[in-house]
Amino acid sequence: MKIGIIDSGIGGLDLLNKIINKYPNNEYLYLCDNLNVPYGIKTKKEVEKYIVNILNYLEKKHINLLIVACNTMSCFMDKLKSLYSYPIYTILDYNVKILNEKYQYDKVAIIATSLTIRSEMYLYKTNNIDIQFINGSYLTKLIEEDDETLIDKEINSLIKQINKDNKAILLGCTHYGLYKNNFISKCYSKIFVEGSKELIYDLPLKNFESKHKLEIYLTKYNKEYISLIKKHLNYNFIIHNITL
């Protein structure tokens, strides 16, 4: 099978690692719109345009299914899903599923980008959950820039904003998952919620006899960025530079 995975940047690499680990013998296409990253500080109109261009491109690549690893991109998928021939799975829907199943009537902190928060999709899709939203857009930017010192400081800053009575924390941007251990080490008394396991479980995938193939598609070729991908990705890949 040919599986597409999309993200505004490197955030989806954590999910990609987990999927390949579970189903190694498939063909994977990871499209990273690093020309326009970060999405979380853009307007809805800008991001919707980027997403439509990406989905149209993937239609031509004849993928069998698409996984939207980016929470901000996920916010636009409900109205776009029916326009394409391939099924679309979003990380946001699986985060919501876990919240609704396990945390009704609880207080939960969601750290997410500005646009994800402004979309109000987590409010719209969750039931009877008291959500504290914390804007982590700056952290997304720092992770893309690979500034480890400032990343650590910003994680500390975000954790200080979490209300003490929150039972759980959802890292509502896949970039933050790359530094989940940093969050846990600084906030070990909280439960960390994530829907990636359920998403992977639901995928209609199996392991074929052929070896896996992984291709990374960048919208801006950059040697330093390729090095950043190698830092977070556990598998060898072929790189492509594309224009959408």
Describe every region a protein language model picked out.
Residues 1-244:
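Non-catalytic structural scaffold of enzyme domains
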